[in-house]
Amino acid sequence: MNNFPACFSALILTITIACPVAVSQEQKPVDIGSRRELFVDQFLIEKLDKAWLQQGTPRDEGIALKFDKPWEGLFCGYVTIIQDGAVIRAYYRGSPKAGADGNSNESYCCAESKDGKIWTKPELTGFDHEGVKTNRVLANAAPITHNFCPFIDKKPGVPASERYKAIGGTMTSGLIALKSADGLKWEKIRSEPIISKAMVPFPYMFDSQNVPFWSEAENKYLCYFRVFKDGIRRIVRSESDDFINWTKPVLMEYTSGNNKSPIEHLYTNQTSPYFRAPHHYVAISARFMPNRRVLNDEQAKAIKVDPGYFKDTSDAIMMSTRPVEGKAHASIYDRTFLEGFVRGGVGAQNWVSRTNYPALNIIQTGPAEMSFYVNQDYAQPTSHLRRYSLRLDGLGSLHANYQGGEMTSKPFIFNGNALSINFSTSAAGGVLFELQDTTGKAIPGFELKDCQEQIGNEIDRIVTWKKGADLGMLAGKPIKLRVSLHDADLYSFKFHKP
């Protein structure tokens, strides 16, 4: 566990030191409109001086859902969380026995919640177990039930009968498409796969949770799915206008700031639009470390893990991608943070194969809180889904310590008349803002010295200067944003009309 590759240390150093990012003065300003910008990458950053991007720290909120029904069991996995109005649903594979991918023991189950914290299992008709109603939405549908992955189709004009869509399948079957009006009763869109083995130029594929969704930012369907390249579990991206006809998949590459990122086994990708900033696709992914054994035979026996599932280990990492910024960005995951996002917890049960796998999607669970979920204790009698929370937008932040630091953005154009920030300071800390022209010269009236220091902890605060908060006269004009902060974090910002 202590053999940390030297190359990782070198890459992480490039993130934590002040590292100016060069930009040409002729570069076309980015039009950010009134969208919210997160601090999970360096896309908008021109220069950092004694400030850095810092990964958020999820809080363990405990067990959300136990996989304790006879048709669920040790090998439950590939979880998707969907919020549909007042109802939140968790879809997950039920699999009480180990077996080949797509075996007949696999089904798909559903749990429901009103707040994302307390979950119940509905009694549904259609897939009884020994005469008892179950919470299964799919059964006797192998191999779809190996990795069924649903979403709400938000494409304008979609028929009510197809409001929900999903895919599932293995390399043998290809990815089969399904539809549903209510997310509970499903049928195939067609018998043939929408993405077949023949379409994918890699030797192995689909052995994972393969993620489809409608992108409001790109106005198309996307599918991020797993392949093997050079023996490594990798991710590819495919596009579609109609959910039936898909483009040749493109291999996703990884960067970390201005550097290439290590290529690691990513078992699941869990890429989805962030709900408060859908041009940011966030991927809380399962990082798999094959043959990196932690437990000895005695420890494995004590936790009753299946003997075939304790000789590797895994954790969760966080990536992001911005394909809306152009083709050059579409095939790149930004791994600004190479460190684990969710580490294995205390106890042998957290250090087995295929545990700590994140569920798909992040949801809001409080006025200032959002949650995601992680599949834990895999292949053990205690198999369950665990909830982790963060502050809204708290995946990453612009951070400076007590001594202080600064960030200067690249040129951008905004729409709106006020700057809203999500931030936190200590009692001694603070944040100041300055608006500049594209040469870096402060715009009169919006200089750092004229800004009211922002002190406190708020999700949405309007920044003011001595002359007020109105920025309408600068809307549509290229500007830069300078941020000076000490003992503080800035989680996001946006320009809008309050």
Predicted regions and their residues:
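Sec/Tat signal peptide C-region and signal peptidase I cleavage site
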Residues: 20-24
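Bacterial N-terminal signal peptides
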Residues: 9-19
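Bacterial N-terminal signal peptides that target proteins for export
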Residues: 1-11
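Carbohydrate-active catalytic/glycan-binding domains of CAZyme proteins
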Residues: 25-498
